[in-house]
Structure formats: structure tokens, C-alpha cells
């Protein structure tokens, strides 16, 4: 199987599994507890059907949308995800260049393996910095100031990782950042020699936003769950979020909102957007899927800030359903991470192109020529 054989999400996942050592593949692929929420994130879309219109003249389709004051050529963007160099040696460089090619937003994690300064010098398309609230206030201030100096357009505070989720696949495989060889993982790494060669020869693994402040994930092996549970400030509250919003002074979003009450409070503290997200099912198993919560959140605050539907998206039709419910855009991590592992920049570009092609085809079949044509009249819940 090669990149040219990848035509959808599942294909990219299969190729990623062939290329990555087991601990690293399962870090992407896994979720919390019994992974019920992880599965529901996608199956939720099956509970609603599309109602197409015909004879609408659909020769030209415009997929553009505007979020956080920036016009994107696509109604979806690449959500911030951590540790991308583990999945391909080009990591965020590959993803950023792919986002630039398609003029969509690129989300950069505080746990990125490439600095905001390098990303900013490399791409001029819209950029989001995703921020964790650490116990170390100096680290928090440094992250904000670096992202501001690098002219990032949006600051997104992740609010659903107050402690690490119970990711049992990681416990079984012994996944750590950086990777370490254990008896349980030795065979897996040995069977993926090209990954190992690239990892060892294509530059040092670093977390540039953290390395001057903490050792976790840089020169000390640690699990991501341990990082969340020990380094992040569990006393974080709405006053802290409001202060960060004011300190940033630009477009500010909360990533991980799942309730109407929290969406309303996000408006109150000055947020200009929220990501309706459960962290890809990686935190609280048994929680609702973003798509399940989307309508009531849009009804409550959709006219006051940008509502993004994040998670579980495998198809263009999933995006159409979320956009029809009122989301301003969609986003996700796995929707491009498998492609990154499968083929680097070329893989991410192929994945984006596939989603774009699906969206154009699906819009035409729906009788729509622009995103604003999509509405709830297009949907029927079962």
C-alpha cells in the first residue's frame, strides 16, 4: 500500500499503521477508557440524514468561510496537535506548508516540535496557537508573548485537559515523549526501521515552547497523561481564562466546550470563538459527541461568536451536516495526522485535497453553491 492508494480517512489510517511503531500509532489512534466516546464522535453523524435539493445550477461551488476575522478557502482547518515530529520527521513543517497551499488555518500546539517563530517565518496563512495553562506562570506568559510576537491570529486555550485521560493503549504500549525502548516496545520499533532511522537522523526531538521551563517531554521521558496531571494548573478557573483573553488582546477561543452554560460564559469573558470538542474522546469517556451538542450550543451563542465543530470527522458529508447545523467551520486532528504519518507533506496535501473534492461533490449533490446555503432545512434527524 502506498500514498496513491489512499482515498479516504480509513486508507490513510491503514498506511499510518504500517509505517509507525505500535506505541506511536496507538498514541494517535487511542482514546480514553473503553473508547465509547471516541466511536460516538463519528457515529453521531449517522443519526441525521441529508435532504438534497435539485435543479439549482451548481456549476461553481465556493467553499470559503470566515472565522476569527480571517477568510479561509475551506470550511475546515487543521486543529492543533502535539508531538507531530513523532509521526513524521517533518512534523509541523509538513502540516503548515500543506495548510498554506490550501489557504486554511493551521493550529500549532504548545507541545509542538517546531517553534511559533519558525512557523510564522514559513507560512503567511492564518495561524492559531493552542495553549495549556501551566502551574508555571512564567511559562504561560512566555507562550503568549512568543505567539503574539510571531503574529499568530488566534489564541486557543484548551480547557478539557485539567488532568490526563485514562488512555489505556498508552499504558499497554509504554508510550512516552520522547520515545524510549522498553521490553514491550522493542519489537515494534525494530520492525519499523525507517521510522527509527528518520527519527535519529532528521534532527533532535524538541518541544521548543517548553524547553526553557520544564524537562517533561524534552530530555526526560514522560507520558502525556503524567504531563497533564503534574504540569497543568488544576485550579484554572473562569477568572484565569478571562485574564488570558484580556492579556492576549486579539481573537481568543476556548477549546473543549461541551455545555451551553460554558458557551455562554465564554461569550461573557470576551471570547470570539469556541471549539465544541471532547479532545477526540481522549479525556472523559462517556461524554457527549461534539455533533450531539452542536445544535443547542449554536442556538445559544452562534450569533455572538464563532462555533467550531471539532472531532469525529471522516467525510465531507460529516462537515456538511455540522455546517448545516450552524457551525462556522470544522476541525480535527486525526483527519490529517494519519496522512502525515502516511506521507509527510504530500500525505497531508492529499488528505486535504480528498476532503475538498468530497465537499465540492457533496455541495453540488445538495444543490448548494456556497457554505451559507447550508441550513437545518437540509437535515432530518432519525
Task: Give a label for each model feature.
Residues 1-46, 289-382:
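Alpha/beta catalytic cores of nucleotide-metabolism and tRNA/nucleoside-modifying enzymes
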Residues 1-69, 178-236, 372-374, 380:
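An N-cap/entry alpha-helix motif that binds or orients negatively charged groups
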Residues 32-33, 110-114, 135, 258, ...:
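Short beta->alpha linker loops
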Residues 49, 64-66, 75-79, 105-109, ...:
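Short, conserved beta-strand segments within well-ordered enzyme catalytic domains
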Residues 72-111:
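Glycine-rich active-site/cofactor-binding loop and its immediate structural neighborhood
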Residues 77-83, 126-132, 225-227:
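Short, basic, glycine/proline-bearing loop/turn elements
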Residues 83, 97, 138-309, 317-321, ...:
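Alpha/beta enzyme core
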Residues 101-122, 126-140:
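A gly/proline- and charged-residue-enriched helix-loop-helix capping module
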Amino acid at each position: 500500500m502506498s500514498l496513491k492508494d489512499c482515498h479516504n480517512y480509513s486508507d490513510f489510517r491503514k498506511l499510518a499503521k504500517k509505517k509507525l511503531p505500535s506505541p506511536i500509532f496507538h498514541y494517535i489512534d487511542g482514546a480514553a477508557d473503553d473508547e465509547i466516546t471516541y466511536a460516538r464522535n463519528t457515529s453521531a453523524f449517522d443519526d441525521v440524514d441529508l435532504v438534497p435539493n435539485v435543479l439549482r445550477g451548481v456549476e461553481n461551488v465556493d467553499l470559503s468561510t470566515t472565522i476569527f476575522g480571517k477568510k479561509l478557502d475551506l470550511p475546515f482547518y487543521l486543529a492543533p496537535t502535539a508531538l507531530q515530529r513523532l509521526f513524521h520527521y517533518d512534523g509541523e513543517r509538513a502540516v503548515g506548508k500543506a495548510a498554506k497551499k490550501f489557504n486554511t488555518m493551521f493550529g500549532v500546539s504548545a507541545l509542538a516540535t517546531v517553534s511559533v517563530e519558525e512557523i510564522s517565518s514559513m507560512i503567511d496563512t492564518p495561524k492559531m496557537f493552542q495553549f495549556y495553562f501551566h502551574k508555571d506562570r512564567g511559562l504561560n506568559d512566555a507562550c503568549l508573548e512568543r505567539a503574539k510576537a510571531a503574529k499568530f491570529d488566534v489564541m486557543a486555550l484548551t480547557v478539557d485537559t485539567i488532568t490526563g485521560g485514562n488512555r489505556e493503549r498508552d499504558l499497554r504500549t509504554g508510550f512516552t515523549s520522547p520515545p524510549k525502548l522498553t521490553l514491550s516496545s522493542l519489537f515494534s520499533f525494530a520492525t519499523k526501521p525507517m521510522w527509527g532511522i528518520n527519527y535519529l537522523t532528521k534532527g533532535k526531538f524538541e518541544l521548543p515552547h517548553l524547553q526553557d521551563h520544564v524537562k517533561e517531554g524534552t530530555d526526560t521521558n514522560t507520558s502525556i497523561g503524567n504531563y497533564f496531571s503534574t504540569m497543568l494548573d488544576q485550579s484554572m478557573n473562569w477568572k484565569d481564562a478571562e485574564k488570558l483573553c484580556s492579556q492576549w488582546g486579539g481573537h481568543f477561543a476556548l477549546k473543549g466546550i461541551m455545555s451551553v452554560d460554558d458557551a455562554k460564559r465564554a461569550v461573557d469573558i470576551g471570547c470570539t470563538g469556541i471549539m465544541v470538542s471532547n479532545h477526540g474522546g481522549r479525556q472523559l469517556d462517556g461524554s457527549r459527541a461534539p455533533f450531539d451538542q452542536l445544535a443547542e450550543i449554536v442556538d445559544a451563542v452562534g450569533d455572538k461568536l464563532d462555533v467550531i465543530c471539532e472531532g469525529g470527522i471522516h467525510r465531507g458529508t460529516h462537515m456538511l451536516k455540522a455546517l448545516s447545523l450552524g457551525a462556522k467551520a470544522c476541525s480535527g486532528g486525526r483527519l490529517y495526522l494519519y496522512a502525515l504519518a502516511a506521507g509527510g507533506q504530500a500525505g497531508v496535501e492529499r488528505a486535504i485535497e480528498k476532503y475538498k473534492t468530497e465537499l465540492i461533490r457533496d455541495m453540488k449533490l445538495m444543490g448548494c453553491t456556497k457554505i451559507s446555503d447550508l441550513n437545518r432545512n437540509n437535515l432530518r434527524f432519525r
